[in-house]
Amino acid sequence: MAFWLPQNIQRRLILYVLQQITLFSNVDITKLDVSLGSHSKFTFQDVDLNISEMNISGCEVNSGMLGKLMLGLTVSGDVHISGDNIDFMITMINEDDFNDMNSFSLAKSFYDLTSSIMQFKPDAHLKNEISGSGSDSPRIPDDYTNPSSAGGNPTTNTYDIIVDDTASSTTESDDSSPIDSIPTSRFNIMQQKVIATALAKLKITLQSVRIRINLGKRKDCNCLDVVVKRIDMSTSEGHVRNFDANGISIAYINNEPSVVPPNNMDMAESLYFSQADASSIYMSALSDANTDIKSLDASVFNSERYELLSINGMSFSFVGISSIDDFAISRIKINLGTLQVNIPFLLKVREDIILTMIFKLISPRHTDKVDVKNSPAYKRFQNELHSNDTNLFSNLAIEEILIGLSSNQKIILRAVDLESNEINGINLSVGDIDLVGLDMDWISETRPCFNASFGKSNTIIELANTIIRVSEHDLILFLKIYYEIMDFIDFVLSKWKILGVKQVSQLRNDEKFSLNVGSLVIEIPLDNSILEINIPNIEHDSLNQDLKLYEVNMTHIVESIKISSLKLKEVSIDLSSARKKMKCYNEHFSQYFVFTHYKVQITGIDSQINLKSLWIIGAVIEQFYIASPVQEYPEATNKNSVRFHDNNKRLLSTSLMINKRAILAKYIIELDDIKVCISGFDADQIRHCKFSLQRLLFLNQIDKGLLFNIFQPHVEIKFFSGSLNDIIRSTNIGVSGQPHLILCIFADKKIKVSIKDIMIFYQAKWLDSVQRNASLDQEKGQNVEYSELPEFSISIRDSAINFLPFRINPSLVILFESIIVTKSGNDALINMHSKVGRFYLTDNYDHLKTTQVMNKTICDSLIKSGYSQIGKFEGLSMTLNKKHKIVNCNGCLEKVILSVCSDSFHTLVQLCMDLKVPVTFPDDKKYQPVPSVAVDLFETIEENEFNLSNLDNKDIDKSIGSDSDSLHIVNSFLDEVEDFQFHEDYNSGTVWSHTTSDTHSSSDILPISLKEEYLDSRRTEVQKHSQSNDRNIISEIDFDIKNADIRLYDGYDWRYTRKNVSSAISELEEGLLSGIQRQEQTESELSRTTVFDSICIATKQKDLGNLKQIISEQVQGKHDHLNSDKVYLYPSKHYKSLIKANELIFKIKIYDSNSPRNEEFNNHAAKLFQITASISTYEVLDNLPTSTWNKFVTLLKKEAWPKSEPMLYFDFMLFKPINSLEATEATINIRSAPLRIHADQYMVDFLLRFFQFNDKRFELIDEYPEILFLQKFKSNTIKLRIDYKPNKTSSGMYSGKISDLINLFVLDESKVTLKGVVLHGINGFNELSEQLVKIWGNDVTSKQIFNILQGFAPVKSFIALGAGAQTFITVLLAEYKRDRSISRSVKKSGNIFIKTTTGDFIKLGAKLAVGTQALLENTEGILSGNATQNRTLADVSQTNKVLDLDSLLQQDQVLIGRNPKIRNKSPSAIIIDAADLEESGRPKVVSLYSEQPLDLHKGLEEAYHALEKHIQIAYNTIWQTNQELRGEESRSAKAAAVTIAKAAPVAVIRPMIGATEAIAKTLQGIYNQLDKSNIEEINDKYKKEDN
């Protein structure tokens, strides 16, 4: 430009040139200073940039200001641009506005930005092509003409020519570049040379650059503030562009709503969001906005600033932009000084930045407009960009990267270097890692510590051997930041997915990625210890697509000693993109397939860990868990989303296809061969505890929750004594490959556990350790607070609980076929239900057999290992609840059946008593014989106070006469007895034999009215009062049993018992043989021996050869297969006695005896627990084959007993009489209903032998033996009605505890009354039994002999008749004395005699008839050899075989048996011979008193059939004899005589038997019609044929 032109013209020319640049189209020439010359300078002040034409995708430029712009030009072509105070304000466009914009691409945004700065006409056309809009061409001054036109005539300007040519060229070919088709002219060539010269010597200096990016259109919206203090750009040889910048920072400004006056609000909004219309090249372009952007900041923003990123120095260089047509860039080099990133601030503002900036800038949008990739500008940009892409990037070097974790905690990465070359690709290295402000060290053995190589076909990442020392606090801080970063990444990916952006493509098959990490050691200092995690090597190869950790070691070090270790073997993480398929089981043990993309497999875990280390590590993990975010699962899923494949779809040819359910999982973790050993228990007995799992499968199901499959779990404890005890063990049962335990944690936090084929052990010895730990915690003042349990459900199938006692060695197994334990809702209610269960018992757990063979059921496994099944139960339900700090347990059992022998019953009782820790104390803790504080009793007594000389007789008389005062004191004392809990028991036990008022005169003594049972009534009131005010109850247990059956078997379950009994028998036989040889013993002398305190074996010399067979028959019954050389002591086939009980109710209250109390209460009593049991009804049945009686014990129905009252009530209470001492006492209260007893001598022998069995192996021996002191025993009056039938009149009871005299009498309805007793101060139960026998025995022998003799069978009827005769005479004399009329007196007394004695006469007649029948049957049996076979019933009560009576009768008729038809009428009763049964056994004899007719009519009918039957039998016998005689005619006469002799007794005696039976049935019918209650008593007493 000519410098001689006027200043105004120079400004106009400069304005014209600047207006070709869109940004400077609004330049005010009044603020332009021009200095022309060899070094020309153009200075602009307060330049308001025209930002209306600046287009940035997703953004709107609101304002642009330059405080000062200086343009320097030299003659040599140097160009120097200097700018100061550069401010831009950009607003992110809202989502709605953004959706209306054109589709985004990097080429379009770059082109829009450059074209908005430089008004190139052809590029404007290209812009229209890209955007698809026909925007108008840039504004050209109206008075502008082409300077080259001649004559000043207006001609077509150069731009128009270019546009036309371009348009025509673009229509010729789509593949040709529009730039190449533009015709060049000399002016264009000159223009390009000038620009190239300027670009070659271009220098740019910018200071105080500020870009504010508003994240919304609201006035108080948040924003990003980008500040650069200084930017210097220079050009060196070879078109190398060098940029130097410092003071770079990016901050987030959180704006609060500002208070702007209403008058300025509109102005502020206009300045904030828009600018004035564009100025023309005339004077209108000189208009001023009159508002400064800085004043805008001060008035609008009241902000809080967060520094996100800062760079103190940056050097950037590249080669390129050599001309306006060459924008190619290559050899980029970047050097950074210190790069500081504040992670907490970034995470805090992540949502604003991501939502409003990142995705609005780079998110793709679908549009129907022209595809930008096909535009010529995009093609030219791609050609320039990729013309030399191998040399595009050269080097990135960063001195330090400061990653701020908090205000004073930073991670420093030093010497970060990123290089790129054609041969090796891209190499990244980190020299060192330092941690500032953290209790953490990063130590690397080599430099650099991190290397990464990114080649064309191979990527390698290496980390040197590293040791990381980090504190627990800092590690938690890192975890929190890590979780926030991962949350941030998930957030970005979720938004990325919503916007439809495709994911990064996977590696190609020819690409290889490998990761190699050397030894990695992480040390976490804890309190006086170090937790060390050592990973020797980490490798990853993209070919194998898995990440391998060959070994992971975790060690807990205390004082340089390794006390715990954990080793993970061969950890493999499958990272392949292929979906993995595995077989899994759900909570119902149903098999299905699971698919996932991520799978982790660990081949083994081996751990030796100390319990203290476990607590420490558990505390650390708990802190990590608290620091980790809670994983939330979606509450509901879309109906269209498919979580698994339904297995209910119909498939063709399903017989050839198995359709299994399938689900999706986020990841799967599979662990094999897990072994964990825990040691260091506080308990003195436990050495260590071992856990082992054969396999563990863990998976995280999508939208469902966590699932664990556990295979072959085994937990055991080893004691210092050497014994090894199991806790949990899988049985050798079930389908191979199925898990034994399944744990499900659902999305709604519910837990479900399924258990199958598992045995859980209860060891009473463990309670000792638990109680010791609890007592230690209590001494330390540590109160354990248990958190509320979540909702859960536990399902148990074919699993068992094994109960092992404390001191003895038997084992009780309760097998549950199905049990469900649930807790629902927020309440503390836990429910348990079980349908069927079984009981198994063994006498020696250590001697069980180990079976390796797979059994079909767990029952088979238990039986083969040595257990005996002793019972089962049905319908178990329990509820557990906690209210007001009291644990309430309610249980109900529908039915329970126990089948036990004497030895197994004794074992079961002893085992149940030993399922707790024995609580015994030495005497110094139970009693306090010496007071803790010495008391001087004579300290307050005057020595001469009670001398006779000092006593006044008047005072004595006066004091003696004041009886009322002393009486009031005593009464007040007695009234206060109610306030004490147990003192009434002591007071009631005191008996006063005399009083101290003997000196009173007889006139002063008032009559005393005695009230019986006054103290008992007072005690009842006190007990009710104490029960209503029970305190310190910690648990209440209520358990009901609807029906209970206890079957008592003869024989023995344990091999040990059978062996000892067999040895005793052998020793007895050997002793008899030796005595016979020495002739020291006669044949009639009885030899005996006793085993287990109850089994008495006695024999004589004549029975020596049959001793074993006799004992076997007593136990098993008569069997043909019994061998006399061997004794059979196994449990009998059928039970010998049955105890039936209904409605058993148990109530247990447990009190807190350890709760802190004041010293004033230490001398008071304290309850420990109270047990209340009641049985509504119970019976004892007699099932001996030789006994004809039915019920051994039943309710005496003739005595009045309320139906609402239980037959048996038992109350037991244990307490401490003095709370500060450990001595315990008990009270017992028993109440029983009147009982009816039918005692057969064999039955009595069996019950005594059964319940007196005592095995010394199961004696419970305590460290400090203690006999329970019974403070009080109370029972009510019990009325008994006894029938007794002896079977052996001379041998007596082998135990010797009952006199032989009782076996001489048969008792029938003997009345015995056991009077109610109240005993105090009893030492143990042995003394209690002795006292009861003494009290009741003396009372019975002294006062009730006559009642017993009334039941003596031979004279009972005569006694009854004598009593009737006595009544007759008494009434006769009384009536005669009153009326003096002999006839009337005889008539009245006769009527009374008949009423009272008729029943006895009939009963006596029936007994005589029955006795005659029995005598005739015995006679027939002796003569014919078939004793009572016609009224015997085989022992089939317990056989499972059902007899077909029709076929039996048909066969019997063909064979002319014992049940003949008479006049084509079936017999009323069926006679079954024991010999005809397949299962032979001792026949069960049916009494002639059973099956009595109900009335006279029924009696006559049965009498007729009985007479008819026996006559028919006699006829059949005679007919059979006649047939035999005809067949034996050819034989001798002797044979015929023998045949007639055998048949004669039957033919003669059988009609007589029929006659006596008919008379008995008739009389029984008459008596039963008179006394209706007799039938019920007969049914209770005698067995029926259908029993």
Swiss-Prot record:
Compartments it resides in: Preautophagosomal structure membrane; Endoplasmic reticulum membrane
Gene Ontology BP terms: autophagosome assembly; autophagy of mitochondrion; cytoplasm to vacuole targeting by the Cvt pathway; glycophagy; pexophagy; piecemeal microautophagy of the nucleus; reticulophagy
Keyword Transport: yes
Disordered: annotated segments: 128-160
Its membrane topology: Peripheral membrane protein
The keyword Methyltransferase appears for this protein: no
Recorded family membership: Belongs to the ATG2 family.
Function text: Lipid transfer protein required for autophagosome completion and peroxisome degradation. Tethers the edge of the isolation membrane (IM) to the endoplasmic reticulum (ER) and mediates direct lipid transfer from ER to IM for IM expansion. ATG2 binds to the ER exit site (ERES), which is the membrane source for autophagosome formation, using basic residues in its N-terminal region (NR) and to the expanding edge of the IM through its C-terminal region. The latter binding is assisted by an ATG18-PtdIns3P interaction.
Protein name (database record): Autophagy-related protein 2
Gene that produces this protein: ATG2
